[in-house]
Amino acid sequence: MSTSIDWSDEAFFESPERESVDGGITNFGPLWHAVSPRWGHSMNAMCSYYGMFPAKLAHYFIQSFTEPGDLVLDPFSGRGTAPLQARVEGRKSISNDLNPLAYVLTRAKTNPPSWMAINEFVSEIERRYHSEAQSEPDVPSDIRMLFHPNTLRQIAFIRSGLLQQEIICWSPEELMLAGALAGILHGAHRRDGSSGYLSISMPNTFSMSPTYVRKYILENNLKAPDQNVFERLRDKLARLYMDSIEGPVGETFKKDASHLMTSQAIKPGTVNLVITSPPYLRVVNYGTANWIRLWWLGIEEVGRQRGAGRKSLDAALDHQHSYDSYRTFFAKTLGGMRRVIRKDGVAVLVVGDVANPGEEPLPLARQIWDDVGEKSGLRLINFIEDQLPTQNKVSRIWGETKGRATERDCVLILARDDGEPAPAAEVVEWEEPYKDRGPDAAHARLRDLRNAL
């Protein structure tokens, strides 16, 4: 067993994850913490993504600073929380992320196919699977150890069909299938041994290294379930489609964020609200944390230090910043925001404090603003400190072994130095008009679908 992480004590492999890691307070009161951790559109549950902010935070600022029809931008969209929330609240959205997983999740949420279309698509793939002779899939041993052979054959068949073309060319149905299956690809089993996931029992939020997982499987005699992937996928889709989704279809890019904001893709002075969380400083490698899901999307060897996929993603995502390089990155990001924000617009940046082993936490948001804010063309109009107990943060599992997030996130609220944003809404409404009769309706839709097959 590893000396730095006691998985058995944390019970990550033996029991399901908690529904939420929320429970904080801000220096201005509860704000978005005042509502249930379950608040938000059902599509938000498509796939976990380390470092994400909750839908209710996005809603709080969308309601505070925009009106229906306004344009919302998230240049580091992660799992697509902000653009999804913008759409269901009647706002237009532009989103962007270089991480292939983030790009797929965001596009799937901002332009999903209809319930019938996605299920017809899944059924057609299932028919092809059963009509063709299936050979043993050619997959890395790091992947093979996670799944029952029958489960893996289904996964590999679906994957081979998706990878006939580049991710950016995928249809709404392909994106939804890819995102939904990514969400059930690996996760913890229930106490009775059953599972809605496809893998051995393991964390859902992130992936430990292949070497560690292999050792843990052997030491704990873990067994992978023999799953009907198509049925588990339909179960997942039924949960995702619990709520209605209407509003303007979002536009999603897979580019360097600062380049996007200085390109002709976004006209100057057109964005009402930027809401985003830039990559945290040295806290997580967004490639290796998702190496299993990235394999599913066609990127090999991300889990290995010298793997080809690891090298290409590290180069593209550029997440191994020193503070000096992070400062340069942040300055470019602010410069791009200054260009696209309207004079009455606002930028909301969620930035986490970080700490190195044996050192005092670095108040990253305050320090980075002090260092680069004056020359950014933006001004600070508010600074919110969001306290979250360290034991509720996923980053606690790395212990004292590397730079990590602390219990505090900070929210920088910025405006153009020559602008005057409208006052924030005094009251934020928490009604969810997109709720479509809840889980009972989802079960009924799934039952009707199965009866029709």
Question: Which residues fall in each region the model found?
Answer:
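S-adenosyl-L-methionine
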Residues: 1-67
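Alpha-helical packing segments of well-folded alpha/beta enzyme cores
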Residues: 54-57, 154, 158, 326-333, ...
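Conserved proline-anchored active-site loop of SAM-dependent methyltransferases
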Residues: 58, 70-89, 93-100, 106, ...
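Conserved phosphoryl-transfer catalytic core
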Residues: 101-165, 299-316
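SAM-dependent nucleic-acid methyltransferase catalytic core
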Residues: 155-160, 164-276, 281-284
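Conserved Class I SAM-dependent methyltransferase catalytic core
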Residues: 174, 312-382
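SAM-dependent methyltransferase catalytic-core segment centered on the flexible catalytic loop
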Residues: 263-264, 269-273, 279-346
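Class I S-adenosyl-L-methionine
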Residues: 369, 377-438
